[in-house]
Amino acid sequence: MSKSNNVAPPCRQDQLGFVPAGYDSDNNSEDEMLMVMPNASTSSGESGRCFDDERIKIVPHIGWRAGIGDRDFDIELDENIANWFEGFRDSFKTFKKGPLISQRLQMFYMNTRNPYEWSLKLFANCPDHNSPKSNSLAYTVLEEMRNFKKHYNLGTDQLVDDNLRMVAFNFVAKQGHCLLFRMVVDIFEFLQCRDLFIPKVREMIARKQYKEAGQIAIDLELFEEFDEHDFVMPLFMQDKISIAEDYLNKAERLQGPVVQLLDSFFDKRQSVESHCSRYITEHEVTDVYYSKLHQKPLSKLVQRLAKNYNIPRQFTPNVNKMKNFGALQFLVHKRYYEKSLNKDSWDEMVRDTVSETDRELQLELVCLCSNFNDQPEAAKWAFHYQLKRSDLPLLVQDYILEQEGNKQAPRTDFDDEQWDAPDSEPAHTLRLDESHVHLVDSKDKFYAMLSDLCRQSMIAFDSEWKPTFGGANEVSLIQLATWDDVYMIDVMVSQLEPLDWAALAKNVFNRDDVLKLSFAPSTDISMFQKALPSFNVMYSSQSTSAILDLQLLWRHVERFDSFRFPYHEESVNQNLANLVRLCLGKKLDKSNQFSNWAQRPLRKEQLRYAALDAFCLLEIYDAIEKQLTHIQLDPNEILNALLNDVRPPSDSGTRRAGRQDGSSGSRRNHRDKYNKRHAYAEDSNSGNSSRAHQNRTKSKGAGLREQQTFEGPNTKSVL
């Protein structure tokens, strides 16, 4: 190590107001040598007072104790190499990384006996070896060593021993540079003797350096040597989840124990925060991220890990119970507060959420119903789950006694009861005959549907799936509506293959000459991509798939001062039900939306709801189009501006009377395609709507349609 021979006494320096380089009064660390000089005197013979805690810190060079058994590694360069390296550093300052620097380093390594050893010596003499970035000199020295080894297929058997590997490890392990460490692992072939570094990783764990220990264990593939308490759980406590998960992905033996341990934090006898605090205290975890140690983020973590590692549900009982309690409370909120669940939807979702074996959750259901003064419903579920009468709330017990006193058995079937409150407001209904609503549950029906859809100029689409309360949702039903028919693809039973879904995407959804209507389609398309990867629907500002978001159209037409919906209503939320009110003057019954779409067969009400949910989109677009035409605004120009992700022009800019023939190329081209589909040049004078044009288009292909008619079953057979 290098020491200065001209160190002024600390007392004198204090009097002069200067502090020598390297002077510090901090506590010493394991890599520092401290010199305490009490009662020192100045060079003039004057004695000065010196404090006991004043110390001179002498920082050793990087090679100190770098080898096995704390042996030093000589980093000094002989005079010739030192002179060469000084010139090389000057060249690096000028040229940075590049062919010249690479060539000079390659030539240096070629003229040494052991390029592995000399690469470490050069690294140690780089001024930036303590913080080597990817464009630094220290990083470049080792990077070129890797290139040299690869180019000349240089082995390590005769040139690299365990001591040199330990030196290389100590040089880069403290830098926190993942790419640098992985490069050194590759150069010196650490994986041949990975057990050599286990004590070093344990030293890091003892120093509470969990992140560094975890990352090194991953890079050295040490997946059998550590348990969940060494650094995986502490990393979760520190919210350094990515490193912990990276390790768990390979350490399969720890996946189950870690998930079970995290699940134990949700034992209802104590709060999640209390369980975490106890673990932190017992294992002396430092740098804890307390703001993430509560129920919501940790429950999501447990569910994600359990899903990724295929952990059976019985290994996460506490999180499952918590999730079911939350789901039940959500159902109660929708039923009794929002009043948006009808009886059938409520019953099937309760049965799906409350299992036949979970007595605690069954009793919670009865209590919640009783709290809303719905004693008949509470009694119904008490008898359904055969709960002990003594465990029931007193109000429910009294209700059952009253029924028995009237010599009537407590009712378990409430089908005849007017369970849903009557509503005087009429609801919007499907105007198509049920014979035109088709359930597509086979390949033959699928391709008959596809033959019809390929001839359409405009369709509407929607989808339904079963709510899973935090789990993965999967599409159950896809609805496709034209003015004449509604097709409902039963995703769960149709047994369609990837090529079939790809054909639907190519021939309908990704065609720019077929206008597709939807309401907030991002969610539906995202579900398609997750559940049906081959059903690759392109929907972005760069695509030309002609998918129109009616919610986006709603926002744009409201900017025009002269635009009025056919039925003016004050709406707070821009949802589909409110848009139906504005355009069609009736409410949209959504009481079947939140129901079990995974059960088979589907109920009649579910099928009617699903068909109407798609068909009403056509009616909405038709109503908005007519209103725009009525106030002399060009619907086609607004449509193409939205499809091309261009801000629609102002009120005056879209008026037919004031519009010039010239327009931008991209918008005009897209408008020309749409004009060909809808023949606006002819229909604008005759007053025909887009529906009239669609009927005309379909009549042209009548011959083909007669050859490939859709053959049942329709809702007459399935409803």
Swiss-Prot record:
Entry-linked Gene3D superfamilies: Ribonuclease H-like superfamily/Ribonuclease H
Record GO terms (molecular function): 3'-5' exonuclease activity; metal ion binding; nucleic acid binding
InterPro entries per record: 3'-5'_exonuclease_dom, Exonuclease_MUT-7-like, Mut-7_DEDDy_dom, RNaseH-like_sf, RNaseH_sf
Cofactor(s) of this protein: Mg(2+)
EC number: 3.1.-.-
Residue ranges, compositional bias (Basic residues): 667-678
Biological-process GO terms, alphabetical: nucleobase-containing compound metabolic process
UniProt keyword terms in alphabetical order: Exonuclease, Hydrolase, Magnesium, Metal-binding, Nuclease
The keyword DNA-binding appears for this protein: no
Superkingdom, taxonomy of origin: Eukaryota
SUPFAM superfamilies: Ribonuclease H-like
Region (Disordered) location: 1-22, 644-719
Domain 3'-5' exonuclease: 575-629
Biased composition (Polar residues): 683-692, 706-719
Protein biosynthesis in keyword set: no
Function: Possesses 3'-5' exoribonuclease activity. Required for 3'-end trimming of AGO1-bound miRNAs.
Record family assignment: Belongs to the mut-7 family.
Name of protein: Exonuclease mut-7 homolog
